[in-house]
């Protein structure tokens, strides 16, 4: 394939959420692994303030170095915009608007954005308006997958096994006595629309609840409180093929008990991205029957939220079987992320995995489907 036949892919990363840095790291890994013989890459960073900039796409600038997290700034490149006009065919134009110089045109967008203002249906809506195909879930599935309350409601409506939980809306300051008795201790307090374990607290005494809610509300006024589930942490990748069929990956396991010398440790932000202390088993050491059940549930969860493209589905393996925790419609793609690892263990290498995602996005197109 010559250069003129390559698919032009805009890799969009950074963004306004508190997962900005992890989005950058994921993008760096993707930029290293997109096959240059098949794809021409346009690297677009979004600053924490929301400005879009055309960058040089250097993966080294998007890595964690000495515990320092990467960030997109206005100095990272040339400021640009994507007009919400399907007649412009994926054109990226310079700013200010009066200049209107076309800096690049793209065939498909890979929105490597984690958290609100990206993974939650917002950029997906923009891309639909602009008429540009994109990798991953559509507007509805992205929004539903981002909000843990509605994810659980959709899972429950399909008869999928979930844990007990309660929701604190902005007008509610704490849990009722009835909710406390129902959930028991310990509980996990989380921003309802967040990821990467940012703002998550483990509460072992109700005296700790108010501080945990305040920590979660630093990131989201809506908070979810989940009953702790005793079990192993399993994950499974789901991938949609260009013909619309859906496949599930090898199952992986995250082992975090006792990390950093604490009995109450969990897979928090530092454990995931900074300390390198969690142990990741791919494939998970589980019976074939359990692995098959997890893969089946992962595909059912994918379909329950009307997902497209890809997802990572997280589980707890309890004494009575797997319980769904959540779905990630744009999982991490860092060098230590489980999603590409699970697919590699399934026989799909990183470049082939990315190529399938892009091909599926192009086959799906935009609009009602």
Curated annotation (Swiss-Prot):
One of its GO terms (molecular function) is metal ion binding. InterPro entries: ATP-grasp, ATP_grasp_subdomain_1, D-Ala_lig_Van_CS, D_ala_D_ala, Dala_Dala_lig_C, Dala_Dala_lig_N, PreATP-grasp_dom_sf. Mg(2+) 2 binds at residues 326, 328. Residues 152-359 form the ATP-grasp domain. Its EC number is 6.3.2.4. GO terms for biological process: cell wall organization; peptidoglycan biosynthetic process; regulation of cell shape. The keyword Cell wall biogenesis/degradation applies. Its main location: cytoplasm. It is found in: Cytoplasm. Keywords: ATP-binding, Cell shape, Cell wall biogenesis/degradation, Cytoplasm, Ligase, Magnesium, Manganese, Metal-binding, Nucleotide-binding, Peptidoglycan synthesis. Pathway: Cell wall biogenesis; peptidoglycan biosynthesis. Binds 2 magnesium or manganese ions per subunit. Mg(2+) 1 binds at residues 314, 326. Gene3D superfamilies: 3.40.50.20, ATP-grasp fold, A domain, ATP-grasp fold, B domain. GO terms for cellular component: cytosol. It comes from the Bacteria. It holds the Pfam family Dala_Dala_lig_C. It catalyses: 2 D-alanine + ATP = D-alanyl-D-alanine + ADP + phosphate + H(+). It is an enzyme of class 6 (ligase). Its cofactor is Mg(2+); Mn(2+). Belongs to the D-alanine--D-alanine ligase family. Cell wall formation. This is D-alanine--D-alanine ligase. The gene is ddl.
């Amino acid at each position: 394939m010559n250069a003129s036949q390559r698919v032009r892919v805009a890799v969009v990363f950074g963004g306004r959420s508190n997962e900005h840095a992890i989005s950058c790291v994921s993008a760096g890994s993707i930029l290293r692994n997109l096959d240059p013989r098949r794809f021409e890459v346009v690297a677009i960073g979004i600053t924490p303030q929301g400005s879009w900039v055309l960058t040089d796409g250097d993966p080294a600038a998007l890595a964690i170095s000495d515990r320092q997290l990467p960030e997109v700034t206005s100095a990272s490149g040339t400021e640009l915009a994507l007009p919400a006009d399907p007649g412009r065919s994926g054109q990226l134009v310079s700013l200010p608007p009066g200049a209107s110089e076309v800096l690049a045109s793209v065939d498909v967008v890979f929105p490597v954005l984690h958290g609100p203002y990206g993974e939650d249906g917002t950029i997906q809506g923009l891309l639909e308006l602009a008429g540009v195909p994109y990798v991953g879930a559509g507007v509805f599935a992205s929004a539903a997958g981002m909000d843990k309350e509605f994810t659980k409601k959709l899972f429950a409506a399909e008869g999928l096994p979930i844990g007990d939980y309660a929701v604190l809306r902005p007008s509610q300051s704490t849990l009722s006595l009835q909710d406390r008795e129902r959930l028991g201790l310990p509980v996990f307090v989380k921003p309802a629309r967040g990821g990467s374990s940012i703002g998550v607290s483990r509460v072992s005494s109700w005296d700790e609840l108010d501080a945990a809610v305040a920590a979660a509300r630093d990131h989201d006024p809506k908070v979810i409180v989940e009953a702790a589930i005793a079990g192993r942490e399993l994950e499974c990748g789901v991938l949609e093929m260009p013909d619309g069929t859906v496949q599930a990956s090898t199952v992986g396991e995250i082992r975090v008990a006792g990390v950093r010398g604490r009995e109450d440790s969990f897979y928090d932000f530092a454990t995931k991205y900074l300390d390198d202390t969690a142990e990741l088993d791919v494939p998970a050491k589980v019976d074939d029957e359990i692995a098959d059940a997890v893969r089946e549930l992962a595909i059912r969860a994918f379909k329950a939220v009307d997902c497209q493209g890809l997802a990572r589905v997280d589980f707890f393996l309890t004494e009575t079987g797997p319980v769904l925790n959540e779905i990630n419609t744009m999982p991490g793609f860092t060098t230590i992320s489980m999603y590409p690892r699970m697919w590699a263990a399934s026989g799909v290498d990183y470049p082939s995995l990315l190529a399938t995602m892009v091909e599926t996005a192009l086959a799906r197109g935009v609009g009602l489907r």
